[in-house]
Amino acid sequence: MKNKVLGRRCIAISLAAALSAGLTACGSTGGDTQAATTETTQITETAQTAERIYSLTEENENQELTMARQPESSYWFPSELLSWDAKTDEDLRFNVSTVPLSERAAREHLQTVNSTQNKETNIMAISIMNSSTSGNPPHGLNKVNANTFTYWQYVDTLVYWGGSSGEGLIVPPSPDVVDAAHKNGVRVLGTVFMPQTAHGGKMEWLEDLLVKNEDGSYPVADKLIEVAQTYGFEGWFMNQETEGTDEEPLTADHAARMQQFIQYFKEQAPDLDLVYYDSMTVDGKMDWQNALTEENLAYLVSEDGDPVADAMFLNFWWTSDTLADQELLKKSAALASENGINPYDLYAGVDIQSEGYNTEIKWDLFENEEGGTYTSLGLYCPSWAYTSADTIQNFWKQENKLWVNSMGDPSADVKKLSNTQWKGISSYIVERTPLTSLPFVTNFSTGNGYSFFKNGSQISLLDWNNRSIADIMPTYRYIIENGNGNKLSADLDVADAYYGGTSLILRGNMAKDTSSTIKLYAAELTAADNMIYTTAAKAKGTEITLNAVLELEDGSVVTLEGDQNVGEEWTVVSYDTSSIIGKTIKSISYEITSAEDVSGLQLRFGNITMMEADSEENAAVSNLEVLDSEFDEDGMYAGVRLAWSSDIAADYYEVYRVNQDNSRSLLGVSNTTSFYINTLPRTDDTNKSAFEVVPVNAALEEGNSAQVVMDWPDNSLPKADFAADVTLAAPGTKITFESLCSANTETVNWTFAGADIETAEGESVSVSYPEEGIYSVKVTAVNKAGSIEKEKEGYIVITSDAADGLVLLSQGAGTEADAYVNENEAPEFAVDGDVSTKWCATGAAPHEITLDLGEVNTVSAVDIFHAEAGGESADMNTKSYTILVSQDGNSFEEVYSVTKNTNGTTHNAFTPKDARYVKLVVNKPTQGSDSAARIYEIEVY
């Protein structure tokens, strides 16, 4: 999604009154992905707050590298969950949400901004917040791409959608998502996903889920409760779609046990939510009702009238042409009321995963005669706005149209749209607000960026995402009243920020002395007698007068004049709040005025602060330690787990590398007392890196920091290796050799005995062999510390029999595998010559597939087409695999091994061998923790 490229540079910046510049050493490039470990030396010291010089952190040049021991958000199969123990979970400190659920203003106090909004309808968003079930860092990484959702004001409950038969079925939300949601007053649910058989579902998993102990307890339910309470989220979404097989059918007994499971869960944890998906009926059939009916009513209320689940998400087909005349939502509301169920505990499902706001919905089936809705609304995959976008700006644009409306103004009238056109969620849902108590501080941060700004100065070019430090965004996106001759529009901006990576920007033209007003926030804030109210802004094009316009609870509107105009540099404007002490603020707007005509105005908002004077304390960090460190095999990149103590909770903990010149380079910002540094580049030859953690409060004041030193492994000597594109060839054939020497290699020397060029230098060399024979090849890696040789004896076979090139031997070969998902993904599809079909095996790795070539042949290469070659995500490409050959099918010899692949297609040439059987062992099936092997084709030559 990144749409700009910045060159590597290191510029020292001081955030004192004057900026001073200096040069620092830039890091090295390169590095492999095979993890290696070494001892670390930890030296902790306390550093007092002082003026710091900041070296501009360079861009991450190795985004594809992920260290093996990166902390990971959790996921389990049911039986695995039973073995989970928080006390021994090394990732626990990274996976716990630390942001409490914010209290929102009461519904009856909310103000509607258009004629179709109502206060009763709830909304549930089932969203893909991370692209896969596994491999998700708890608090982001040094990448900008992330679903940094920003329309929380329209959501009451977020379901963190995940689960797959190849990774895990029980998926708690990652803590960064919970933190962002809680900050906005949104409840978050994890997912319990029982997939259909076609998607790898197994009845044994459902049986594991529903196991009941002799004492009447349900062990998996107890674990679900423990996970939610330990990690700090509000409950679970139950998605049971495993329909069974003829041999293992789904029955009414499963349905009854599911109801009992849910009741037990609610008895043990009444404060946690459990939402049931309209799928399995009470008679044990997979029969989506698309409504509340007698077939699924028992999942909400038992025959005895006892409550079961808290709510139900209704399937999507109530709006289809075939079911429209049944008015299923109207009937659902009626049946709910008859049984003492709040109709707004039913969520009418709308599937927008494929088409987003282009999805046609018969909204009249959702709307009732009183101007409200029959049920609440459930959106499946509003994450479409992110996954279908090619730039971050397009993501914001699509998100705005999806959640607000096509006019980008929640106060706009959408009645003129046709019945099936997308009206925007703001047409039904009144905006919620968590602004109910001081302090209120926003830096307009979306939780990601292409760089990081501190007090308005750019201190890092490192891409980043961490939704845990996202801010509360404007409630109204956007309501602007332009004065005569003015034309301003609003959006988010990644080019500049006050703190974080984004700001709010207004662009357009203004007439002299003519005001425009932008309404930003709904609130229910009582002004304290010592309240500080400031706004950081900057204007390009002219100076701007920026007055605050506050609507009060009694309906009056107060305009507070700023103490200074806004110029081209970040300006912190203060407002005197003495006239509103003790009064309740209902909305926050700004009046913008220019003293001259201006076109091309750019007005950025970087921070709004409302807090009681002296209410923010400064934290002190201590006990900073390196919990764990690992290094790539070249010792050029590190993955580092840091943890520390803090005497009081800080809003932010800034993590820096301390450079040799004592300047600081920002590595990231955390809201917890731990942080993971991924792919930290080695920047010098001292074999040490010092880190500093600086606590920062909501007023952006620094507390006392702490430092620690980590040791790097000695990687002074290079490592030598190489590969050839062909190892079996005819005389005179050009063969290309590629160096696989380590990144610290300065010179690569080659020896080709018997070739037309017998010695050479360079990363890549092409030679030919004029005579038939078997030849060895040697490479020497050289740097200032010394040299290392690697020789492969008998590596090249030259024969006239290869004059017509390599022959494909494997198409249609016999196959045997240790596992496969179903008959549509059986092992024979790996040799059918079609890259749109695959062999897929689930369960714990490694996975094996063996090809029978029918007779003994000379084999010298195997091409493998991984997930990406078949159209799947590159994250699903096989990372580690081994190729073995055999003449008898019993005794196998390893001929090739890969530990760090990221490519969708791999060519693996090795010393020619006589073999009938070729075995592929998939050791690490994906780039993350997904254990499903996906091989679209294997070609043996």
For each predicted feature, which ranges?
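Beta-strand-rich modules
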Residues: I677-N704
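Conserved aromatic anchor
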Residues: Y637-A649
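Extra-cytoplasmic beta-strand recognition segments
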Residues: L158, L504, S516-A548, V573-T577, ...
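Aromatic, loop-rich ligand-recognition surfaces of beta-strand-rich domains
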Residues: A523, T535-A537, M610-E612, V831-E894, ...
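Chitinase-like catalytic core of GlcNAc-active glycosidases
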Residues: T116-L328, V898
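Juxtadomain low-complexity/linker regions and immediately adjacent membrane-anchoring helices
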Residues: S55-D91, I170-P175, A181, Y795-D832, ...
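Extracellular/lumenal mature domains of secreted and surface-exposed proteins
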Residues: E692, N704-D801
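Short carbohydrate-recognition loop motifs
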Residues: N486-S516
